[in-house]
UniProtKB/Swiss-Prot annotation:
GO terms for cellular component: cytosol; nucleolus; nucleus; RNA polymerase III complex. GO terms for molecular function: DNA-directed RNA polymerase activity; nucleic acid binding; zinc ion binding. Belongs to the archaeal RpoM/eukaryotic RPA12/RPB9/RPC11 RNA polymerase family. A zinc finger (C4-type) spans 4-28. A zinc finger (TFIIS-type) spans 65-107. PROSITE patterns: RNA_POL_M_15KD, ZF_TFIIS_2. Zn(2+) 2 binds at C69, C74, C99, C102. This is DNA-directed RNA polymerase III subunit RPC10. It comes from Schizosaccharomyces pombe (strain 972 / ATCC 24843) (Fission yeast).
Length: 109
């Protein structure tokens, strides 16, 4: 994917008057003939879920609420929680909980 150095828009590959491939900008007159084979590959490292959500310490900085722990071996009624919109915007937010006592985690949609 190439971008126009003049206006910054995405360049398309088009065939010029001589039948050669060229990068053309749809919004300005920028035209760049392609004279060599162009290829580049970028591999991105996928982040771990803990990196995105903040890791182990993320829950401790959140609010607490009264909710019964879903771990059957725990009788605690307090949990840290946060909400995320992980589905489409017309769906309700998902609430993630972590027990303050046993550290058990669960979610409600």
């Amino acid at each position: 994917m190439q971008f126009c150095p003049t206006c910054g828009n995405h360049l398309i590959v088009a065939v010029d008057e001589e039948g050669r491939n060229a990068f053309d900008c749809r919004t300005c007159p920028y035209h760049f003939p392609i004279s060599t084979f162009l290829y580049s590959r970028h591999e991105f490292a996928q982040k771990e879920v803990d990196d995105v959500l903040g890791g182990e310490e993320a829950f401790e900085s959140n609010q607490q609420t009264e909710v019964t722990c879903e771990n059957t071996k725990c009788d605690n009624n307090r949990a840290y929680f946060f909400q995320l919109q992980i589905r489409s915007a017309d769906e309700p937010m998902s609430t993630f909980y972590r027990c303050t006592k046993c550290k058990f985690q669960w979610r409600e949609n």
